[in-house]
């Protein structure tokens, strides 16, 4: 009877103690550490020697069996979500198992996506290396990064990694790489894009080409020569310098790229070699020399000298010289008129038009008029005269004498005011 009583008393004390698994924190986020503890409430560790092992689902974690009742997990990830439990083994190979505990790992969505460039500022020389760095301020787990070119969105590359930043590299930048870029990051909660970043590719100027343009095939003194310099490649703005031999003629700017022109009025000293230089701050390039040769005719020099002397004399003598020259010309004109027509005598020979006295109406003789040049102002005078036959009767002579007395004093008669169609008499003669 006594052995049975002792068995009933000792039975509860001899049963294996219950195990509990404790996770700290119990609801971890991705990337955070977690500590697992295998615990027996009524059993002190000094009372017995145990070996512990931790499991997730059916897989053992850590180093396997260990004397430590704790397991430290450095970082938990979304895929670490599952059912966890632990086991304890006594020296007598008795194994105790805890209940299962569900641990859910929470993922943080990506946020605040940004795109940066290296070199900074988005300006890069042609042929240099360009790096596009996509970053997120927050987000956990595996993040997929994608890079796009242009507002339309040409996909360049994608990377998936457990990191807050990722890089896309262009080893050697070309002119066609000048565009707008952006990146997208996502970790299972939808894509989150960055802002647009403009990339400017700076291109050094190529060797410029110089062209000389003259108004004629053979350039001459006083012609305006156009010097046109153009670099076919190069980022604007471009500054052009123009040279005659090694003498600087001037400069012109092309703010939007392309070429520029410089005009030069040619003199005798402008024969020789011309060149130009292009510079956009990334290095200067000089054109090949262009030779311009032209000759100055001797006659042109003497004519140029004579006209210069005359112009100098006129400018020195001034209005007095002009007045004297005018008076001299007027005097010559008056003398020429006097020699040709002294005292405005009748024209000789007389016009061969006749009116005979034996006509049926002898009293209706018509005078013959000819215009005389202007005497003064705008008045025009005419010359009137008669012709008489050499052989006439006595009666006719008497009549002719009477008629001559009547008109002899009336040789000049004023006819009318001058108009624009009157012709100078002496000019008509």
UniProtKB/Swiss-Prot annotation:
One of its GO terms (biological process) is B cell activation. Residues 329-429 are cytoplasmic. GO terms for cellular component: cell surface; external side of plasma membrane. A motif (ITIM motif 5) lies at residues 423-428. InterPro entries: Ig-like_dom, Ig-like_dom_sf, Ig-like_fold, Ig_Fc_receptor, Ig_sub, Ig_sub2. Its main location: membrane. Induction: Down-regulated in activated B-cells. Glycans are attached at residue 293. Disulfide bonds join 38-86, 134-183, 229-276. The chain crosses the membrane at residues 308-328. Primarily expressed in secondary lymphoid tissues by mature subsets of B-cells. Detected in spleen, lymph node, heart, skeletal muscle, kidney, liver and placenta. Specifically expressed by mature B lineage cells with higher expression in naive versus memory B-cells (at protein level). A motif (ITIM motif 2) lies at residues 367-372. It is a single-pass type I membrane protein. Pfam families: Ig_3 (PF13927). A motif (ITIM motif 4) lies at residues 410-415. Residues 17-104, 109-200, 208-291 form the Ig-like C2-type domain. One of its GO terms (molecular function) is coreceptor activity. It is found in: Cell membrane. Phosphorylated on tyrosines upon activation. A motif (ITIM motif 3) lies at residues 379-384. Residues 1-16 form the signal peptide. Keywords: Cell membrane, Disulfide bond, Glycoprotein, Immunoglobulin domain, Membrane, Phosphoprotein, Receptor, Repeat, Signal, Transmembrane, Transmembrane helix. Residues 17-307 are extracellular. Interacts with ABL1. Interacts with GRB2 and SOS1. Interacts with SHIP-1/INPP5D. Type I transmembrane surface glycoprotein preferentially expressed by B-cells that regulates BCR-mediated signaling responses. Recruits ABL1 as the intracellular effector molecule to enhance B-cell activation. Also plays a negative role by suppressing ERK activation under homeostatic and BCR-stimulated conditions in a GRB2-dependent manner. This is Fc receptor-like protein 1.
